[in-house]
């Protein structure tokens, strides 16, 4: 049994997220593989929710105990994570500073005024746009923001990009795996594969540890959307090792149990390909399930392609982890102006 119970948790979500069968998407892909989705995009009333809240539930107690008064984080201009940090700060009564780096070469005229960044500002966060490019690692701009809060007499609590390399960043998605096991028992089925987008790494990393408990670590198929696969894999490896130790998995996760596919991140982080756009439209038109051009659109593209290529044996049950992120589609309004 994984020792997730020894960590404090601050509730930010509605609880267990639903799993639904996607019959029309299943049929559109030939019907030989059954597609399901776990709807972490519907997990909370905090500013449209999303996967980062699972992570933040285990980070907030540490922030409160540190006597911080300001959460400080970082992401791109259309960052789901900074939206969720801003929402969390508003909910728990802290101030919030978020650095929003220019991770995406955007062309839409309203990219920096709608969607995630609009909601981040609406919730009172101090949103600071910085011209630095994409990188999933620890950033100087974030460290500068933390120092600026100190210089102003505040007490900052730093949360890195995606909450991923935070010591507790992987715990929430260990909990995801435990939820899935309980839901499988209720539904009378068992999923053969889990599809998840990976960039900063703690969502997949936590899942890998969680599913390692029942021998399914290598069935967690990460679809890279970073375009920096070596860096992403190294970060996932680090998160897996740290999280496995925290929850007392009792063994080291092997390298071959960390499965990340690098075929779908093109042409660049945050830039959808024609195939990404086709996947977004197919999910929307078959299941009214909205995915975004940065993350979920690419993992949806990956899953669709894998089904078509026969990656999953006939009769497989595939669980698509919908992590949220739909607000970002507003930053791509020209691309989707006609649907």
Curated annotation (Swiss-Prot):
One GO term of the biological process aspect: 1-aminocyclopropane-1-carboxylate metabolic process
Cofactor: pyridoxal 5'-phosphate
Catalytic activity line of the entry: 1-aminocyclopropane-1-carboxylate + H2O = 2-oxobutanoate + NH4(+)
Catalytic residues of the enzyme: 79 (nucleophile)
Top-level taxon: Bacteria
Transmembrane regions: none
EC class: hydrolase
Modification N6-(pyridoxal phosphate)lysine occurs at: 52
Keyword entries, A-Z: Hydrolase, Pyridoxal phosphate
MF terms in GO: 1-aminocyclopropane-1-carboxylate deaminase activity; D-cysteine desulfhydrase activity; pyridoxal phosphate binding
Keyword presence, Glycosyltransferase: no
Catalytic activity, EC: 3.5.99.7
Functional description taken from the UniProt entry: Catalyzes a cyclopropane ring-opening reaction, the irreversible conversion of 1-aminocyclopropane-1-carboxylate (ACC) to ammonia and alpha-ketobutyrate. Allows growth on ACC as a nitrogen source.
NCBIfam families named among the record's database cross-references: ACC_deam (TIGR01274)
Quaternary structure note: Homotrimer.
Family recorded in the similarity comment: Belongs to the ACC deaminase/D-cysteine desulfhydrase family.
Name of the molecule in the record: 1-aminocyclopropane-1-carboxylate deaminase
Gene source species: Bradyrhizobium sp. (strain ORS 278)
């Amino acid at each position: 049994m994984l020792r997730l119970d020894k960590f404090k948790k601050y509730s930010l979500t509605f609880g267990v997220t639903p799993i639904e069968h996607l019959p029309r998407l299943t049929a559109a892909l030939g019907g030989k593989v059954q597609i399901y989705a776990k709807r972490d995009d519907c997990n909370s009333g905090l500013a449209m929710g999303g996967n980062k809240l699972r992570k933040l539930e285990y980070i907030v107690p540490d922030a409160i105990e540190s006597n911080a008064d300001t959460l400080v984080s970082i992401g791109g201009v259309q960052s789901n994570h900074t939206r969720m940090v801003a929402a969390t700060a508003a909910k728990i009564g802290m101030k919030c500073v978020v650095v929003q780096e220019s991770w995406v070469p955007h062309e839409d005229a309203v990219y920096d005024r709608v969607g995630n960044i609009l909601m981040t500002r609406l919730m009172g966060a101090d949103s600071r746009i910085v011209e630095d490019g994409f990188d999933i690692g620890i950033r100087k701009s974030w460290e500068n923001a933390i120092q600026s809060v100190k210089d102003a007499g505040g007490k900052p609590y730093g949360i890195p990009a995606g909450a991923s390399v935070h010591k507790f960043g992987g715990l929430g998605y260990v909990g995801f795996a435990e939820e899935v096991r309980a839901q499988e028992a209720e539904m009378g089925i068992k999923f053969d594969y889990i599809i998840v987008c990976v960039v900063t790494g703690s969502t997949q990393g936590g899942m890998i540890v969680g599913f390692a408990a029942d021998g399914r670590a290598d069935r967690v198929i990460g679809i890279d959307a970073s375009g920096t696969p070596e860096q992403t894999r190294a970060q996932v490896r680090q998160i897996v090792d740290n999280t496995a130790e925290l929850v007392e998995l009792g063994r080291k996760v092997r390298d071959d149990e960390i499965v990340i596919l690098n075929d779908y991140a093109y042409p660049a982080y945050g830039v959808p390909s024609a195939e990404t756009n086709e996947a977004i439209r197919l999910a929307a038109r078959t299941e009214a399930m909205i995915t975004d051009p940065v993350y979920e659109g690419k993992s949806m593209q990956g899953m669709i392609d894998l089904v078509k290529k026969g990656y999953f044996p006939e009769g497989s049950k595939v669980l698509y982890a919908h992590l949220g992120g739909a607000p970002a589609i507003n930053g791509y309004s020209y691309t989707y102006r006609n649907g």
